[in-house]
């Protein structure tokens, strides 16, 4: 918890909620009988309502992108390093909005929410949701906030996929699209990682076919394993070598057993056990499926340039050299497709050793690229 809030922080923030009562038609063919979104805002919306930027979060992220909910918080929001007064995403120039997407578990409607027809949690009766569905709800949130056009839509990882979907589905509603550490679709290997994670959850004896809420339990072992597997893919080999090497826990000798010997084992177990306390297992299943299904080019016979042909936004695409989950090669696919359809696109490959999680870190070159680009956006709109 902070002794005092840093001057360059957005400070104390309060989540807000909005409930939409009209049925939401989903890409899977089903619908939700209304839904709730939880979101946060940072900065001030100008009189012209032209300085709004939408932030799209990743798999385990949420609406809390920066600042603190109380002085008791152990740590600030997930993009604290980049979002705040005078930072790369400058709250003195822009008004930022970040919403928890449906299917998640941080306040927006998801599997743990109450099904109005049964009075019990949805569980696996919750309909499948997709990136396109998330973008649709974000557009409804923009309408609610009176924002006709975003100055930019920005997102990393799964958030970057939402940015791409925004540019295709609502081309007239964003001026700039910032796609960070993302891919135009998952590879077979990435789908395989997600499936192993899902199986870890679904084969846990405490899963109860997704109805573990009624049993006052949760699939702790399965969700913990899923997080451990996922976390390995977010880090590079060099990052793990630098952080852990083959160091034993506390420098002790081998136990010659199956308890924790190495620091990296201790780290992964901590990541797994702490994740269980803050995330819902069913949400993890739904979100990873949405990741798997994302493939906007499939509508166009696999031609990504055709998928981008209707876009109007200017693009900034950023990748990280050590990211093997969504490698620079995947970002270059996006850039090439945008070039092919004559879109304005800037590209930066950032040298970083942190792997996929680099998009969350204050790497100087990354900060400079983002700050310069958004600075030009601010000048363009007179912010």
UniProtKB/Swiss-Prot annotation:
It holds the Pfam family Abhydrolase_1. Belongs to the AB hydrolase superfamily. MetX family. InterPro entries: AB_hydrolase_1 (IPR000073), AB_hydrolase_fold (IPR029058), HAT_MetX-like (IPR008220). This is Homoserine O-succinyltransferase. The lineage of its organism: Bacteria, Pseudomonadati, Pseudomonadota, Acidithiobacillia, Acidithiobacillales. It comes from the Bacteria. The gene is metXS. It catalyses: L-homoserine + succinyl-CoA = O-succinyl-L-homoserine + CoA. The active site is at 157 (nucleophile), 323, 356. Gene3D superfamilies: 1.10.1740.110, alpha/beta hydrolase. Keywords: Acyltransferase, Amino-acid biosynthesis, Cytoplasm, Methionine biosynthesis, Transferase.
